């Protein structure tokens, strides 16, 4: 699945520019790849395993 990975507080993982950081973060979660979605200033992962939680507007717990 694809989506925004979360940190321990349930927030999207922030990024500013460049994809290397997000690609590394996503691959640690067993995704196929990741990039920095600049408009949202957050990492976005593609090809995540189904059991990895991703950020969802409906269940957002980020302060």
UniProtKB/Swiss-Prot annotation:
The keyword ATP-binding does not apply. Residues 1-63 form the LCN-type CS-alpha/beta domain. InterPro entries: LCN-type_CS_alpha_beta_dom, Scorpion_toxin-like, Scorpion_toxin-like_sf, Scorpion_toxinL, Scorpion_toxinL/defensin. This is Ct-IT1. Its main location: secreted. The lineage of its organism: Eukaryota, Metazoa, Ecdysozoa, Arthropoda, Chelicerata. SMART domains: Knot1. Keywords: Amidation, Disulfide bond, Ion channel impairing toxin, Neurotoxin, Secreted, Toxin, Voltage-gated sodium channel impairing toxin. Beta toxins bind voltage-independently at site-4 of sodium channels (Nav) and shift the voltage of activation toward more negative potentials thereby affecting sodium channel activation and promoting spontaneous and repetitive firing. Is highly active on insects, since it provokes paralysis and death when injected into crickets. The modification Glycine amide is found at residue 63. Expressed by the venom gland. Has the structural arrangement of an alpha-helix connected to antiparallel beta-sheets by disulfide bonds (CS-alpha/beta).
